[in-house]
Amino acid sequence: MKQFIDFIPLILFFIVYKLEPRIVELAGHSFTFGGIFSATAVLILASLLVYGTLFLIQRRLEKGQWITLLACLVFGGMTLTFQSETFLKWKAPVVNWLFALGFAASHFIGDRPLIQRILGHAVSLPAPLWTRLNLAWVAFFVFSGCANLFVAFTFHEFWVDFKVFGSLGMTVLFLVGQGVFLARHMHEHSTESAAKSKD
């Protein structure tokens, strides 16, 4: 569920991006609404609202959420300041690669891989499987970052569509794959444990 909360600002960004730019008057001021720059402003405001609400409810944000929020503020802010969408195109690759770096670094920092620290309270697996699972997340984030970068700078007309639906689709497929992997190995692990207890 937490992964999909991150997509709320992105979906609002997509909706505004697809609007035909038009002049809107508000409180005596007129401005253009629709297109990439209006969508970027909505992305920033929606991110602040979503993560601000989560912070008030939970009294904290996870590190990944802080990274996503800060990246949105930095890259979105530069996009609006310099009126160039190039900065925003780098946001998804950089965020994904930072996540990949965090998962990879956990093999050398701390006593457990990062995915085990996240899921270890609910799932029991042998250490080698936790390592494989963690490396799968590293590979996913590296691939996702590269895919976003390639599409953003190769297919200009479709990069926003891919940013929303491509990223969401890849995430859903990967999570389903992870669920199948966990279910299969949890069953094997519980069967082995039961057999050992009988011995």
UniProtKB/Swiss-Prot annotation:
Where in or outside the cell?
Cell inner membrane
Keywords of this protein's UniProt record, alphabetized?
Cell inner membrane, Cell membrane, Membrane, Transmembrane, Transmembrane helix
Mention any one GO cellular component term assigned to this protein in its UniProt record: plasma membrane
Q: Which Pfam families match?
A: IspA (PF04279)
On whether Cell membrane is a keyword of this UniProt record, the answer is yes
Q: What membrane topology term does the record carry?
A: Multi-pass membrane protein
Note the InterPro entries from the entry. Answer: YciB
Annotated membrane-spanning segments are 4-24, 36-56, 64-84, 90-110, 135-155, 162-182
Q: Which family does it belong to?
A: Belongs to the YciB family.
Matching HAMAP family: YciB
PANTHER family under this entry? INNER MEMBRANE-SPANNING PROTEIN YCIB, INTRACELLULAR SEPTATION PROTEIN A-RELATED
Q: So what does this one do?
A: Plays a role in cell envelope biogenesis, maintenance of cell envelope integrity and membrane homeostasis.
Q: Specify the protein name.
A: Inner membrane-spanning protein YciB
Organism expressing this protein natively: Azotobacter vinelandii (strain DJ / ATCC BAA-1303)
